[in-house]
């Protein structure tokens, strides 16, 4: 070949080499920083702009090309001085021995070196660190395969000279530095167009086709085509060559020479047929991938719940064997798997919507795609701080009968999952709230609040807080919550009841079928957790006082939360925010404004109304699709994702962790898949039964009998299936008392706030689903006035508890608990904050039992920390993880009384409870009685006494021992004990029934004139070992005041009487003798006679009473008694036949025409008498023509007005008009017969009418005959009783016609003969006929229509009507009289008689109800009302006037009196009890105190001011001082003593530690980083090398 042609070919080959993948424009990245130049001195960067230093430790591995200000550059091959190339340690390319740079198109593996010079050293080390670098010569430039550096180092670049930037042209060759153009005769043909590789189907076989465009030329050309593929080592392997005159080539995809998954290339060169050795440069095609591609939407995702699609496509057609079954669809099935990189125990962090996809056969390929499908993937929300992780999605080997497809494994892809924080919020006990970001504050307010609201999705939690029994300070506790996620709404509530009595109930108000919700119980129901599909959960730790809540926020809510739990953005400073998310101004009480901001108005919370939520669209379920389920730990070993494999599609599994390290019992089905969606927790179900539930789950795996363990059954319990038992015991408390709470809300709610009242007991039925949907109740705390109460608690407490003793108890209870000791490394400072909460709880409530409430927080926090980080740091924590898991499963390690199983404690015989701490052999302990043991028989049913304590067990043998105490002389003596019925509520509360005569007053003993009944109570679980005794006092609140404020005794009230052992309030009358009354000022022990009794008073009578002869005269006397006594009427004198009823109704049948005098006597119950005489005038009855007189009801009785009732044929006011006159010849052809005021007609025989009565609503047929023709006429008669008449003329020629009209009441029946129409009679048919007859002198005006006289009504006038009508439910009687209901009198029952004497200006509304004036209440308005109520035991004497006990004064007895007065600003809290100002203590508060106390020998020199010894500082002298600052993360733990990390040592932690040690004189310059001497390298400098320097 001539030299010129050779040069041309080489030049064209350079072009081909430049087409390597890394040489292509998208195959590499650029490093353009001018600082990388070897000539750039980086000293000034270190002095002024450290952030601009070149540090390639975070450089992504890949191919790079260097540019300096857009000028081509390459790595230098000579040693570069330190502090050049924009960095401290520049990296250059070292060519050792005979190494050279790669020639064009070649790639070489070379070594790069970093230059470094140690401090105080005079020589530099050009190759202190070595990094492998691959170099590819792309012709005009070079690219480098670079790796990230170990530290802050930088790769150098050197600009290419101008001479090298302008090589000779493609048709030129370099000769002596000059470019000489070649001769035209030796030029090769122009190259072909870039080939393209495609797959096509030819006769059921797959072929790769390489085709290209042919350049235009004058000569005949041929083509040389070469096939190659890229090996797994990224090296091209030639497959075959072909010389052809066709512009394409075919190569079969046979699975042997060419397989699926190959990356295929073809190249084509052109040659002249006349001169075959002259060829063009070979042009290579783009890479063609034959097989399946997995193309993710994003390769880097976050744990934020978002979903992404994965496109799976095939670049080759899907074909099926001709021998395959005809009914099978032609497809290729792929099974997907996910493999997480890194340590196996991290668990999976990627989930797929399906582990199985199908690629179906298509008719053709388009845009390089022959078939495709989709599957969704998402990050697993694992609630772990596992950092950013990478997972592979791989495809299992394809199983197919076609050799081409069988065992083909498509390339996997990598998905990087970025970790997103999750957080927990705690609201415990008082409650103390710890926000998502860790800020701690107290919310002592009551009401309903927004606890947690997501701005990124439909999720919200409302919490209710009630007053929880602090005797001295206004504190609150959680009593329930409602949580909503989308369409799922769950309520867990115990607010509708009284403190320590109410039981929590849980129900699902709404459910979204597209989501999964889970409800679980742990520790025998002490923990209840609601899990939502997003991963959020709400856990309630139950107590008799309410519940503590733990809320978990998933990563999807990061930076998207509002409410009392804060903003969840890892910045606690902005947790106090308003409803718009804006931070509330910083001030001393900004938390108060923050709490008020999130308080919900009454009736607006989800507890009161069902929120409107849009049903979320259906989302795909996800599977783990893990590679090997056995390779991952089970749920007990902290795996957060289920390992079940779904064959076709994912159904129920989630991409969110819903597992717990604390053993749990899934009880979801009890609330979702049952007719009743509510079950009361811990009510009527003992812990033993819950334990039985757990055992039932494990019975098929564990033989508990062989272990000698107690399955905790009792006689009677094993008869029922435990779960069925729970299902049958579904009650709720509060429904039955709803109406009472609405009526007596003020008094009822004070029962919750005042511990000293005895709460009522009610029985409540089960609730239906309809009840649950409408279940709302009145929550008084929502309506209470929001008043910020400042209080200053101080030590010691009123009961004498000191701060030191309380702190010791809290530390022992919490820090020394099993969870506190074993999980200390994880709890850290959280343990200290929980101990502080414990101390504050005891201080505020003065009750040591609250010390245990914080253990639940430690359990939840420990579980959280282990889930977040513990299981990923097994090297650091060692075997302590296993110990912690054991104590989470088995609290207190089963107290040494049982064996720890996977599901919890299996207690030994005679022990029970979730931690086996309760012993059956141990007698229970009574701590107190309901309402401190006092019960007022006037207010409550004292038959049942609520007993609070510890160790109660629901056993058939549980019983109460009740002993009546008899007062003998000066002491109480016990009587015979009685064993009574016991109602078990839970392990801390039972009800004891007292004997049936407990409320009979004759059972009370007079103690100095004070009637009191005392009973001693004991409780036993087994009937043998009884608890300590407690005394309950039954008293009559009408006469006595009992309670704590009366020094545990009772005192008799003023203004009461004690008569015959019974108690009466002043003004009470003798039940059998109304004239005897209680007058304590006259006699407290006998009845007093009702003095100054006034006689009854008759109300004003009518001026004149009249009646008429023959009237049944009735008149009602009305009177009242000033004292409210009953009145009795008697007739003293009057006419014969007259009488008066005891109620005052006078009756007389008037049979005389003379005026009569009547005398009536009125007597009250005390025989006071009043006489009244009335005169009645009798008028005559002036009705004529036999008419009779009746009373006119339009006038009141006694007016004497009457009406006349006339006989037929007469009318007029006095019946004076005769209406019986006849018309001329009224009978026509018949003969006229006259009668008394009437007439009749005697018809000829031929016109006589046969009358037959028929039933009502029949058809009346009249047959008329004329000219031998019969005509039938039918008519309906529905208004009267029909008659069927047959008029039978004797002659067929007769024609009937009436000359004169018959009138409206008659009809023509024969020639000139009219007869009465049906329903009418009389000579002129003027009298209508009514059947039945009209009563009470009613008049028949139309057939069967009566016109009634005044005072009567109805169809036949048989109903009495009174005018005016009777009032107040009175019944009308004959004679326009009213009979009145109880409590009303008068002619129209218009006067009410009040049976109660309404006092203090009250008015009688109904006979038994008084309407009181403001400030008074009670049945007779005798009790004054003080608002606000009298405090500190004060009694309400008059409206808003309190009578204070000794030691208190003020309008509401709110001020205490201390003598001597409190010093130094101390506050008088109650009688002679001072509360010290902060910083002082002592009897006179003369001592200053430091709280917390000074540490490390510091002295308290002022309130909370410490004087620290040398070497210590800080407010508490708790901060050590190191004069020489600790370096490299060391911590100053004592004066001038540093605690160093494991990789540093020395006084100031300034000396690094290399393990293993550096060899051959190497020096340790960083932890585990050696600086080797010249000619040595390696991690430990263990390798000896030769360095060639240039």
Curated annotation (Swiss-Prot):
The keyword Secreted applies. Residues 1268-1280 have a biased composition (Basic and acidic residues). Residues 1-20 form the signal peptide. Residues 1177-1216, 1294-1326, 1358-1390, 1422-1454, 1455-1486, 1518-1550, 1551-1582 form the EGF-like domain. Residues 423-606 form the VWFD domain. Disulfide bonds join 425-565, 468-477, 1181-1189, 1183-1204, 1206-1215, 1298-1308, 1302-1314, 1316-1325, 1362-1372, 1366-1378, 1380-1389, 1426-1436, 1430-1442, 1444-1453, 1458-1468, 1462-1474, 1522-1532, 1526-1538, 1540-1549, 1554-1564, 1558-1570, 1572-1581. Residues 1268-1288 are annotated as: Disordered. One of its GO terms (cellular component) is extracellular region. It comes from the Eukaryota. GO terms for molecular function: signaling receptor binding. InterPro entries: Dev_Signal_Modulators, EGF-like_dom, VWF_type-D. Gene3D superfamilies: Galactose-binding domain-like, Laminin. The keyword Heme does not apply. It is found in: Secreted. Its main location: secreted. Glycans are attached at residues 367, 703, 968. Keywords: Disulfide bond, EGF-like domain, Glycoprotein, Repeat, Secreted, Signal. This is von Willebrand factor D and EGF domain-containing protein. It comes from Homo sapiens.
